[in-house]
Amino acid sequence: NFNVIPPVLEGVRLLFGCELNIVDYSGTIDLSERMLKRLSYTVVSLHDLCLKPGTMEDNTFAVLTALKNPYVTILGHPDDGKFPLDYEAVVKAAKDNHRMIELNNTSLTPGGSRIHAYENDRIILPLCASYKVPVIMNSDAHFTTSVGDHARAEALLKELNFPETLI
């Protein structure tokens, strides 16, 4: 309930955000504009519980359209091989729409649910560097012990000599 949360708590300005699901190949997201207006940041993502993985063309069109939404801030884990994407088109759209791309530490966990994430991030990150698209690291912690754990993401950024100015 946004009405009971103060905008500043113990001297810290609070930011509000959520992860949005792309629910169709037209790029529709699953939160009303009324709620989106109250958020500081949003991450838009493809999840196979919300949308059956489609063709590269279908998935890419959905992402490109979602990135045009003025309430979207970040594209979440575009590295999931279950949803093939035209990575160059996606990175260009992120640049054109002033969006960040998430580098998700959990995606890089061996045996995780996202397939070929490491290989796909090795394609996405150089494109981000080339087009000067900022990335944001996220632990994507689903349990307290993983909060703030960016070890795999940091190692990949270092391996690729990714510019710190874009992180």
Q: What are these model-derived regions, one by one?
A:
Residues 18, 139-142, 167:
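Acidic carboxylate-rich catalytic motifs and surrounding loops in phosphoryl-/glycosyl-chemistry enzymes
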Residues 21-23, 108, 144:
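Short, active-site-adjacent cap segments at secondary-structure transitions
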Residues 84-92, 111-127, 144-158:
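Histidine/acidic-residue-rich catalytic or RNA/ligand-binding cores of hydrolases
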Residues 133-147:
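Short acidic/histidine-rich active-site segments
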Residues 146, 163-166:
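Long, positively charged, glycine-interspersed low-complexity recognition regions
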